Amino acid sequence: MGILVVIEQPEQPDLLVVHASGSDPDVPGDPLPVTACGIDTASMAVDPWRPSGPGSRWYPPQYAGHVCPRCERAVRSA
């Protein structure tokens, strides 16, 4: 199961938060129902970016300042 980048789409774009979600095993490319930090993914957008390989970041560099710290910890500890 891969990690998908899912983006909370708030009313204010400067409050963007990037979360990690596992990939749904039944529908590849769709996120699981909740993020790694436990937030519902139903209203989130899936970013098409994928890590280049083992050891690379799970999120695109342009989102580095917007990563959910709880998702980051969950991905690193997995």
Please place each PLM-identified region on the residue numbering:
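Short, intrinsically disordered terminal segments enriched in charged and Pro/Gly residues
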Residues: M1-G29
